[in-house]
Amino acid sequence: IGEVTSFEACANRDLDLLASIFRFLRMPGGGICYDFGVYYLTAIVSLFGPVDSVVSSVRNLAPKRVNVVPDSPEYGQEFDYSNESQAFTILEMKNGVTGTFCVNGDSTINDQAVFTIYGKKGILKLVDPNNFGGDIVYIPGVKDWTQQAVPEVLDYGFAYSENSRGLGPSEMAEAIAEGRLNRANAKMAYHVLDTIDQIMKSAETGAFEKVPSTCERP
């Protein structure tokens, strides 16, 4: 796709339903960013490297919610939800690329994610980082505006595109044997959480916030 000019990662959930089922989502750290957005931010950092600064709008649309699960003993009862349910963020990466990261927990099930990279020569539509498998679609650029670009589904070029939850420990073992840093390493995980902390801080200050930590792009 040539030089990358921007990216977007957006996803939705239904926290009325999910927080009715999973009580831990009501606890500190169970908000839409910390519980769900980490998958998308980790994918962004894996592709583009560390985040330099962020500016965001974060809110909780419904601090009081009603249990919507008929089988639950709390069905129809009100419960407190004190975490963030929405976050809309501009990410400035250390490599100079800027993109958007948006998560909305006040929507519906099933989750519908958009993860797109825009380049000067084409566009990549990536799979949902919260799921396994899916198609990576390449949309080539056209020079004649009367022509319609023809999307192409790309071959992954490697195995383990489906449910492969043991892949991380397996790659870690290879990294230890080869004397290198594993891809899903602690520094990257810390940087992603640090980025979310600054997203929360930016929503309070109304300004760009630098992300103090950094990491290597895997």
What does each model-found stretch correspond to?
Residues L61-S82, F88, M93, G105, ...:
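C-terminal glycine/acidic-rich active-site capping loop/insertion
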Residues C33-G37, N182-Y190:
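Conserved loop-to-helix N-cap of the C-terminal "lid" that shapes the substrate pocket in Rossmann-like
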Residues V97, C102-N110:
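Glycine-rich phosphate/pyrophosphate-binding beta-alpha loops
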Residues V51, V97-T98, K121-I123:
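Structural motif
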Residues I1-D80, G206:
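Predominantly a Rossmann-like dinucleotide-binding segment in NAD(P)-dependent oxidoreductases
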Residues A189-A203:
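C-terminal hydrophobic helical "lid"/dimerization subdomain
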Residues Y40-L41, P169-S170, I196:
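A general structural signal for well-ordered alpha-helical segments in protein cores
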